[in-house]
């Protein structure tokens, strides 16, 4: 007999507390579903912005004497193109959290409203990516973080 690991994070209910972090496995519906079907309690999409971004040129991962160093530069297809992937993961039964980012509170709120259309369960705000000057600035200023969170929460009905 298995253990009941159901977890609640605010209004968001998870079948267990393991969550795929935002990253390269969160770019397509099939990859999100692979992680979901492997037992994750929720899956988080790759961070997405209003417009597409190519990120840094290769190599984005290099081996060092101490291990691996990764710097992707927030590549993403833009919110319009990721909606189908999010919908596919939702149709497969996954609990989906969309990771969003922008240059200011209005852009964060816009992207959050767009991903909400795909019926995602919650929104994650990428507030502190060290590879983005705007996000680095936002993440270091509590007042800016508060403004982004407030703006985003005002714009969506799902948990932020």
Question: Residue spans of the language-model regions?
Answer:
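Flavin-dependent oxidoreductase catalytic cores
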Residues: 1-160
